[in-house]
Amino acid sequence: MDELKKTKELVEKYLKKKYPDAQFTDEDLEFLARFSVKKEPKEREILKELGLISGKGTVQGYYANHKSVKNAKDCIQAIYERFNTKRNSQKEKEHPVDVFGDDFEAFFAWWCEKTPEGGIRKCCYCEVDEDTVRAAFAKDEKDKCVISSKKRSFSGELQIERKNPNGDYSADNCEFACVICNNAKSDMISAEDFKKFFVPGIKEYWAHIEEEIKKKNP
């Protein structure tokens, strides 16, 4: 199968999960595959080549009339930033491990595979969904939140967990995990023992947090 066609199909598969009600043309999908996933430069030139803008048309004008494409582009860019941050952090370590073969498309394919229909991911251990985690860390008008931490890495985003902490970041070794599970599980505890002895208490904790969120946002 043609490489670009495979990338377009991957983009389409992810967008159907993330934005099930949005409509994308074949040209939209090719643009996102080339610019957002394959990281081809010259955004305007790609749009012109695909007939998405013409004459004095601008990139900004295209996005103004195609908000679903703008949202999709921004979403894929956020995923790329997660990949790039992980890759760069490993490069700074004395003993770095491989991050998806230094290939964003491989990382994006894994992300897509781990994203369920509807686009809401869950922790692989305690099964809390990311909407709950985000709500717990969200600040209100008084700059208060249900869960707070001084560590920037402790946030409402699900983290990338290596099942084997000594292994690479790869499709068969990575899952999404909430910040609580990801930081509670160490290389001393197997996934099976963690689920058996620790996860029940963490589930109770998240149930408590959900009640606190409801009180905060009645």
Task: Say what each PLM segment does.
Residues 6, 15-17, 34-42, 48-98:
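Secondary-structure boundary/linker elements at domain or insertion junctions
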